[in-house]
């Protein structure tokens, strides 16, 4: 799903950390008012208002009427396997991530994705540095710091080096041009629900 397709639907953003807030700002800038969902609920509304420049209610997952949502964009910290998320899908809601949407829109670009259990940040940083020393313009984004949604509206660069956590990769349907797997070991099993899912 592209950003334009997302903006044509009723959107909920689950998780108001860095990635969720960046997506909320992007949607608001395009005239879309998302439903915000977070396990902390209304208590984070003042911080959210300051971060996105608009007063929006923040609902607890149990407060969301899934019939009023077409697409749920989950933040990386929200497990793909949570019962509330499974219930949303059963109600017909499409579940995706900001990373998946961005990759749909930037599939034509030179994207180097770095993932793995350990070593992602180091590898992504080294790759970006090597590319910059070759005279290429580089954006180093993703799990390493700046959310990928911050890239919308910016001038293009030669190479996008993207650190991708297993949480972010779960709903990705478009493959980057190059993907580096640094290592693979049993980790984050509480989030994934077991070794097979991880």
Give the positions of each predicted feature.
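Phosphate-binding loop of NTP-binding sites
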Residues: 67, 76-197
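N-terminal leader/targeting and accessory segments in enzymes
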Residues: 1-97, 101
């Amino acid at each position: 799903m592209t950003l334009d397709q997302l903006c044509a639907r009723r959107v909920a953003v689950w998780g108001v950390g860095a990635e969720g807030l960046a997506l909320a700002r992007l949607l608001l800038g395009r005239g879309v008012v998302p439903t915000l969902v977070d396990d902390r609920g209304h208590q984070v509304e003042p911080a959210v208002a300051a971060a996105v420049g608009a007063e929006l209610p923040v609902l607890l997952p149990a407060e969301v009427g899934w019939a009023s949502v077409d697409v749920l964009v989950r933040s990386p910290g929200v497990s793909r396997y949570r019962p509330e998320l499974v219930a949303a899908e059963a109600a017909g809601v499409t579940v995706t991530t900001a990373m998946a949407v961005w990759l749909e829109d930037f599939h034509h670009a030179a994207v180097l994705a770095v993932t793995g259990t350990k070593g992602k940040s180091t590898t992504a940083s080294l790759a970006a540095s090597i590319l910059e020393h070759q005279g290429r313009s580089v954006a180093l984004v993703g799990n390493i710091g700046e959310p990928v949604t911050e890239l919308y509206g910016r001038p293009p660069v030669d190479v996008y080096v993207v650190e991708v956590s297993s949480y972010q990769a779960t709903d990705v349907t478009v493959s980057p041009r190059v993907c580096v797997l640094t290592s693979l070991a049993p980790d984050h099993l509480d989030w994934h629900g077991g070794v097979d899912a991880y």
